[in-house]
Curated annotation (Swiss-Prot):
Protein name: Ubiquinone/menaquinone biosynthesis C-methyltransferase UbiE
Highest rank taxon of the organism: Bacteria
Biological processes annotated in GO: aerobic respiration; menaquinone biosynthetic process; methylation
Organism: Paraburkholderia phytofirmans (strain DSM 17436 / LMG 22146 / PsJN) (Burkholderia phytofirmans)
Keyword 4Fe-4S: no
Highest classification ranks of the organism: Bacteria, Pseudomonadati, Pseudomonadota, Betaproteobacteria, Burkholderiales
Length: 243
Protein backbone atom coordinates (compact mmCIF):
# COMPACT_ATOMS: atom_id res chain seq x y z
CA UNK A 1 0.00 0.00 0.00
CA UNK A 2 1.28 3.47 -0.88
CA UNK A 3 2.56 5.73 1.86
CA UNK A 4 1.75 9.39 2.44
CA UNK A 5 2.15 11.87 5.26
CA UNK A 6 -0.15 12.67 8.16
CA UNK A 7 1.53 15.69 9.64
CA UNK A 8 5.11 14.54 10.17
CA UNK A 9 4.14 10.85 10.29
CA UNK A 10 4.44 8.45 7.35
CA UNK A 11 1.22 6.44 7.08
CA UNK A 12 -0.68 4.27 4.61
CA UNK A 13 -2.94 6.32 2.34
CA UNK A 14 -6.06 4.63 3.71
CA UNK A 15 -4.95 5.33 7.27
CA UNK A 16 -4.45 9.02 6.48
CA UNK A 17 -8.07 9.41 5.37
CA UNK A 18 -9.23 7.85 8.63
CA UNK A 19 -6.87 9.93 10.75
CA UNK A 20 -7.87 13.21 9.05
CA UNK A 21 -11.52 12.27 9.52
CA UNK A 22 -10.83 11.71 13.21
CA UNK A 23 -9.25 15.14 13.55
CA UNK A 24 -12.22 16.94 12.06
CA UNK A 25 -14.83 14.86 13.88
CA UNK A 26 -12.99 15.99 17.03
CA UNK A 27 -12.71 19.70 16.22
CA UNK A 28 -16.06 20.32 14.48
CA UNK A 29 -17.99 21.55 17.52
CA UNK A 30 -15.33 24.13 18.45
CA UNK A 31 -14.12 24.96 14.93
CA UNK A 32 -15.25 28.59 14.74
CA UNK A 33 -14.10 29.43 18.27
CA UNK A 34 -10.68 27.91 17.67
CA UNK A 35 -10.27 29.69 14.34
CA UNK A 36 -10.88 33.01 16.07
CA UNK A 37 -8.47 32.18 18.90
CA UNK A 38 -5.69 30.78 16.71
CA UNK A 39 -5.74 33.54 14.10
CA UNK A 40 -6.78 36.44 16.31
CA UNK A 41 -9.79 36.78 14.02
CA UNK A 42 -7.62 37.15 10.92
CA UNK A 43 -9.26 34.15 9.25
CA UNK A 44 -12.29 36.36 8.69
CA UNK A 45 -10.22 38.89 6.74
CA UNK A 46 -8.59 36.11 4.69
CA UNK A 47 -12.01 34.74 3.79
CA UNK A 48 -13.37 38.20 2.98
CA UNK A 49 -10.47 38.71 0.57
CA UNK A 50 -11.25 35.35 -1.05
CA UNK A 51 -14.91 36.26 -1.38
CA UNK A 52 -13.99 39.55 -3.03
CA UNK A 53 -11.62 37.84 -5.48
CA UNK A 54 -14.24 35.21 -6.35
CA UNK A 55 -16.52 37.99 -7.59
CA UNK A 56 -19.62 35.79 -7.56
CA UNK A 57 -22.52 37.35 -9.46
CA UNK A 58 -26.27 36.67 -9.59
CA UNK A 59 -26.96 33.41 -11.36
CA UNK A 60 -23.50 31.89 -10.79
CA UNK A 61 -23.04 28.23 -9.95
CA UNK A 62 -20.50 27.86 -7.12
CA UNK A 63 -18.91 24.80 -5.52
CA UNK A 64 -17.48 25.32 -2.01
CA UNK A 65 -15.19 22.34 -1.33
CA UNK A 66 -14.18 21.59 2.27
CA UNK A 67 -16.78 24.20 3.13
CA UNK A 68 -16.64 23.45 6.84
CA UNK A 69 -18.83 25.75 8.90
CA UNK A 70 -20.02 27.62 5.83
CA UNK A 71 -18.40 31.06 5.88
CA UNK A 72 -17.80 31.12 2.13
CA UNK A 73 -21.05 29.38 1.21
CA UNK A 74 -23.02 31.93 3.22
CA UNK A 75 -21.50 34.85 1.31
CA UNK A 76 -21.73 33.14 -2.07
CA UNK A 77 -25.39 32.21 -1.57
CA UNK A 78 -26.28 35.84 -0.98
CA UNK A 79 -24.26 36.97 -3.99
CA UNK A 80 -25.54 34.30 -6.40
CA UNK A 81 -29.13 34.97 -5.37
CA UNK A 82 -32.24 32.98 -6.19
CA UNK A 83 -31.11 32.38 -9.78
CA UNK A 84 -27.76 30.97 -8.68
CA UNK A 85 -26.67 27.65 -7.23
CA UNK A 86 -24.23 27.29 -4.34
CA UNK A 87 -23.18 23.86 -3.07
CA UNK A 88 -21.77 23.68 0.45
CA UNK A 89 -19.70 20.48 0.60
CA UNK A 90 -17.29 18.69 2.91
CA UNK A 91 -15.82 15.20 3.10
CA UNK A 92 -16.35 15.15 6.88
CA UNK A 93 -19.88 14.48 8.08
CA UNK A 94 -19.41 16.27 11.41
CA UNK A 95 -18.09 19.44 9.75
CA UNK A 96 -20.84 19.34 7.12
CA UNK A 97 -23.53 18.98 9.79
CA UNK A 98 -22.17 21.89 11.83
CA UNK A 99 -21.94 24.04 8.71
CA UNK A 100 -25.41 23.13 7.48
CA UNK A 101 -26.98 23.91 10.86
CA UNK A 102 -25.08 27.20 11.08
CA UNK A 103 -26.25 28.24 7.61
CA UNK A 104 -29.85 27.37 8.46
CA UNK A 105 -29.59 29.39 11.68
CA UNK A 106 -28.50 32.35 9.55
CA UNK A 107 -31.46 31.86 7.20
CA UNK A 108 -29.29 30.60 4.35
CA UNK A 109 -30.85 27.69 2.50
CA UNK A 110 -28.38 26.03 0.15
CA UNK A 111 -27.70 22.36 -0.67
CA UNK A 112 -25.18 20.53 1.53
CA UNK A 113 -23.37 17.50 0.17
CA UNK A 114 -20.86 14.99 1.55
CA UNK A 115 -18.17 15.24 -1.12
CA UNK A 116 -14.70 13.82 -1.75
CA UNK A 117 -12.73 16.40 -3.75
CA UNK A 118 -10.87 13.59 -5.52
CA UNK A 119 -14.20 12.28 -6.89
CA UNK A 120 -16.44 15.32 -7.36
CA UNK A 121 -20.00 14.12 -8.20
CA UNK A 122 -20.80 16.80 -10.78
CA UNK A 123 -20.57 16.86 -14.58
CA UNK A 124 -17.85 18.55 -16.60
CA UNK A 125 -18.08 22.31 -17.19
CA UNK A 126 -20.75 22.92 -14.53
CA UNK A 127 -19.51 25.64 -12.15
CA UNK A 128 -18.52 29.26 -12.63
CA UNK A 129 -16.45 29.29 -9.44
CA UNK A 130 -14.89 26.55 -7.30
CA UNK A 131 -13.33 27.35 -3.93
CA UNK A 132 -11.43 25.35 -1.34
CA UNK A 133 -10.42 27.09 1.90
CA UNK A 134 -8.06 25.38 4.35
CA UNK A 135 -8.85 21.97 2.91
CA UNK A 136 -6.34 21.15 0.20
CA UNK A 137 -3.49 20.37 2.59
CA UNK A 138 -5.53 17.54 4.12
CA UNK A 139 -6.11 15.80 0.78
CA UNK A 140 -4.05 12.72 0.01
CA UNK A 141 -3.82 13.17 -3.77
CA UNK A 142 -3.72 16.92 -4.26
CA UNK A 143 -2.99 16.59 -7.98
CA UNK A 144 -6.10 14.46 -8.48
CA UNK A 145 -8.24 16.90 -6.48
CA UNK A 146 -6.98 19.92 -8.44
CA UNK A 147 -7.67 18.15 -11.74
CA UNK A 148 -11.19 17.33 -10.56
CA UNK A 149 -11.81 20.94 -9.56
CA UNK A 150 -10.72 22.07 -13.01
CA UNK A 151 -12.91 19.44 -14.69
CA UNK A 152 -16.13 20.73 -13.15
CA UNK A 153 -15.35 24.37 -13.99
CA UNK A 154 -16.94 25.98 -17.02
CA UNK A 155 -14.60 27.48 -19.61
CA UNK A 156 -13.43 30.82 -18.12
CA UNK A 157 -14.43 29.51 -14.67
CA UNK A 158 -12.05 30.12 -11.78
CA UNK A 159 -10.60 28.05 -8.97
CA UNK A 160 -9.61 29.78 -5.72
CA UNK A 161 -7.45 27.94 -3.18
CA UNK A 162 -7.05 29.60 0.24
CA UNK A 163 -4.49 27.74 2.32
CA UNK A 164 -1.73 28.08 4.88
CA UNK A 165 1.59 28.60 3.14
CA UNK A 166 5.23 29.54 3.70
CA UNK A 167 5.67 32.48 6.07
CA UNK A 168 8.14 35.29 5.41
CA UNK A 169 11.61 34.05 6.48
CA UNK A 170 12.29 36.70 9.19
CA UNK A 171 9.14 35.54 10.99
CA UNK A 172 9.83 31.82 10.73
CA UNK A 173 11.28 31.27 14.23
CA UNK A 174 8.48 33.15 15.96
CA UNK A 175 5.91 31.39 13.79
CA UNK A 176 7.39 27.98 14.65
CA UNK A 177 7.18 28.70 18.37
CA UNK A 178 3.58 29.83 17.99
CA UNK A 179 2.66 26.82 15.84
CA UNK A 180 4.24 24.08 17.93
CA UNK A 181 3.83 25.53 21.43
CA UNK A 182 0.88 27.91 21.46
CA UNK A 183 -1.52 26.14 19.07
CA UNK A 184 -1.49 22.79 20.93
CA UNK A 185 -1.86 24.68 24.23
CA UNK A 186 -4.90 26.54 22.87
CA UNK A 187 -6.31 23.25 21.63
CA UNK A 188 -5.94 21.66 25.06
CA UNK A 189 -7.16 24.72 26.96
CA UNK A 190 -10.30 25.47 24.94
CA UNK A 191 -11.12 22.24 23.09
CA UNK A 192 -9.50 19.56 25.30
CA UNK A 193 -7.65 18.35 22.20
CA UNK A 194 -3.98 19.25 21.86
CA UNK A 195 -3.27 16.43 19.41
CA UNK A 196 -5.51 17.74 16.62
CA UNK A 197 -3.86 21.15 16.78
CA UNK A 198 -0.41 19.56 16.76
CA UNK A 199 -1.51 17.93 13.50
CA UNK A 200 -2.62 21.33 12.20
CA UNK A 201 0.86 22.77 12.76
CA UNK A 202 2.55 19.77 11.17
CA UNK A 203 0.20 19.64 8.17
CA UNK A 204 0.96 23.29 7.41
CA UNK A 205 4.69 22.53 7.27
CA UNK A 206 4.11 19.60 4.90
CA UNK A 207 1.92 21.58 2.50
CA UNK A 208 3.48 22.86 -0.76
CA UNK A 209 4.78 26.43 -0.67
CA UNK A 210 3.41 29.22 -2.84
CA UNK A 211 5.44 28.53 -5.98
CA UNK A 212 5.03 24.76 -5.75
CA UNK A 213 1.24 25.01 -5.46
CA UNK A 214 1.19 27.45 -8.37
CA UNK A 215 3.04 24.87 -10.48
CA UNK A 216 0.67 22.10 -9.34
CA UNK A 217 -2.35 24.14 -10.42
CA UNK A 218 -0.74 24.79 -13.80
CA UNK A 219 -0.01 21.08 -14.19
CA UNK A 220 -3.69 20.40 -13.44
CA UNK A 221 -4.54 22.48 -16.51
CA UNK A 222 -5.32 25.87 -14.99
CA UNK A 223 -4.11 29.02 -16.71
CA UNK A 224 -3.04 32.44 -15.51
CA UNK A 225 -2.35 31.11 -12.02
CA UNK A 226 -1.36 33.79 -9.53
CA UNK A 227 -1.22 34.03 -5.78
CA UNK A 228 -1.62 36.64 -3.08
CA UNK A 229 0.37 36.40 0.13
CA UNK A 230 -1.72 37.34 3.16
CA UNK A 231 -0.33 38.13 6.62
CA UNK A 232 3.31 37.79 5.50
CA UNK A 233 2.66 34.47 3.81
CA UNK A 234 1.01 32.74 6.74
CA UNK A 235 -1.77 32.21 4.22
CA UNK A 236 -1.84 32.46 0.43
CA UNK A 237 -4.75 32.69 -1.99
CA UNK A 238 -4.08 31.02 -5.35
CA UNK A 239 -6.36 31.79 -8.29
CA UNK A 240 -6.42 29.97 -11.63
CA UNK A 241 -8.71 30.01 -14.66
CA UNK A 242 -9.91 27.22 -16.95
CA UNK A 243 -9.58 28.08 -20.64
Amino acid sequence: MSKTHFGFQSVDEQDKAQKVAGVFHSVAANYDLMNDLMSGGLHRAWKMFTIAQANVRPGYKVLDIAGGTGDLSKAFAKQAGDTGEVWHTDINESMLRVGRDRLLDKGVITPALLCDAEKIPFPDNYFDVVTVAFGLRNMTHKDVALAEMRRVLKPAGRLLVLEFSKVWDPLKKVYDVYSFKVLPWLGERFAKDAESYQYLAESIRMHPDQETLKTMMEQAGLDGVKYYNLSAGVVALHVGTKY
